[in-house]
Curated annotation (Swiss-Prot):
The gene is MT-CYB. Belongs to the cytochrome b family. Component of the ubiquinol-cytochrome c reductase complex (complex III or cytochrome b-c1 complex) that is part of the mitochondrial respiratory chain. The b-c1 complex mediates electron transfer from ubiquinol to cytochrome c. Contributes to the generation of a proton gradient across the mitochondrial membrane that is then used for ATP synthesis. Binds 2 heme b groups non-covalently. This is Cytochrome b. The lineage of its organism: Eukaryota, Metazoa, Chordata, Craniata, Vertebrata. PANTHER family: CYTOCHROME B. One of its GO terms (biological process) is mitochondrial electron transport, ubiquinol to cytochrome c. It comes from Cephalorhynchus hectori (Hector's dolphin).
């Protein structure tokens, strides 16, 4: 009798994606983050669904509805903090996943990579509109500052901002539409994830050496299912530790104050996972220039495959490129730190230097060093 998983139309798709999928035999734990992102997405959709059952997207009741969830709903506090810290875990996994792609040259699968960049932008948009929903001080002022950046667009800027706001300031209409966006975007992310996987399974996975592994494949199940379960347990352990022991560690205390248009917080800053981009935005004294730099800091990922000058795909055997890669990571950590600091000396100059280094590393140094390494191959 033929196995049902190989004959049933639906089971066949799942089988080819998660069970009989031929996988390189040497992929490391850096390849775990894809499945962890899937797990994060499922957790966020489920916790978000339960939160939406009790939340009211109205300026007069939004803040108190979140307080009600935490105080009166059974395990409401737990669901709320799982959702908030789940977003942080989501971004940790995202950045690790992108870092893996950069290090091992996975960006050479261009369709998969471009869908991935689109996914990153969608997740960032979802996180931004979600942060506005509790209607605390940082929610309100974060929404005001970030949406206001669109006014830097010549001619249509102001009209565009007022169109997004649904009025002349961030108000009831803004909150309602942001809730609608926050509800729909995760399902768009789920659809994009399916396309991401579709393109990946057209080519098969990359591996740490960057060398084709067609002659050395093993089935995904049981080898990588068990490996992914171990990764998932680690993720859940960290998430639970964060949620139960330090739920507000990554949040902003200002968000426990209800939104007040008449009182600006001393330091307006986004959640930690946006700080690097925020630092790049602030490092340019011109509004339009800052907005362009902010956009480019993310969209630069699209150009990575075009900047590949090395004859080797992976950085595994390229020590000089490795050095630059880890310099880039250190630079991003510096930018993250700067983004959370006030705009004063010496943070301004450090942020500007770190921003210049970020673009210089990706656009100039890495391609140049790759060419030098090509020359060294002939020695």
């Amino acid at each position: 009798m033929t196995n049902i998983r190989k004959t049933h139309p639906l089971m066949k798709i799942l089988n080819n994606a998660f069970i009989d999928l031929p996988t390189p035999s040497n992929i490391s734990s850096w390849w775990n983050f894809g499945s962890l992102l899937g797990l994060c997405l499922i957790m966020q959709i489920l916790t978000g669904l339960f939160l939406a059952m009790h939340y009211t997207p109205d300026t007069s009741t939004a803040f108190s509805s979140v307080a009600h969830i935490c105080r009166d709903v059974n395990y409401g506090w737990f669901i709320r903090y799982l959702h908030a810290n789940g977003a942080s875990m989501f971004f940790i996994c995202l950045y690790a996943h992108i870092g893996r792609g950069l290090y091992y040259g996975s960006y050479m699968f261009q369709e998969t990579w471009n869908i991935g960049v689109l996914l990153l932008l969608t997740v960032m948009a979802t996180a931004f509109v979600g942060y506005v929903l509790p209607w605390g001080q940082m929610s309100f002022w974060g929404a005001t500052v970030i949406t206001n950046l669109l006014s830097a667009i010549p001619y249509i800027g102001t009209t565009l901002v007022e169109w997004i706001w649904g009025g002349f300031s961030v108000d009831k209409a803004t909150l309602t539409r942001f809730f609608a966006f926050h509800f729909i975007l995760p399902f768009i992310i789920t659809a994009l994830t399916a396309v991401h996987l579709l393109f990946l399974h057209e080519t098969g996975s990359n591996n740490p050496t960057g060398i084709p592994s067609n002659m050395d494949m093993i089935p995904f199940h049981p080898y990588y299912t068990i490996k992914d379960i171990l990764g998932a347990l680690f993720l859940i352990l960290i998430l639970l530790a964060l949620t139960l022991f330090a739920p507000d560690l990554l949040g902003d205390p200002d968000n426990y104050t209800p939104a007040n248009p008449l009182n600006t917080p001393a330091h307006i800053k986004p959640e930690w996972y946006f700080l690097f981009a925020y630092a790049i935005l602030r490092s340019i004294p011109n509004k339009l220039g800052g907005v362009l730099a902010l956009l480019l800091s993310i969209l630069i990922l699209i150009f990575i495959p075009m900047l590949q000058t090395s004859k080797q795909r992976s950085m595994m055997f390229r020590p000089f490129s490795q050095l630059l890669f880890w310099t880039l990571i250190a630079d991003l950590l510096t930018l993250t730190w700067i983004g959370g600091q006030p705009v004063e000396h010496p943070y301004i100059i450090v942020g500007q230097l770190a921003s210049i280094l970020y673009f210089f590393l990706i656009l100039v140094l890495m391609p140049t060093v790759s060419l030098i390494e090509n020359k060294l191959l002939k020695w």
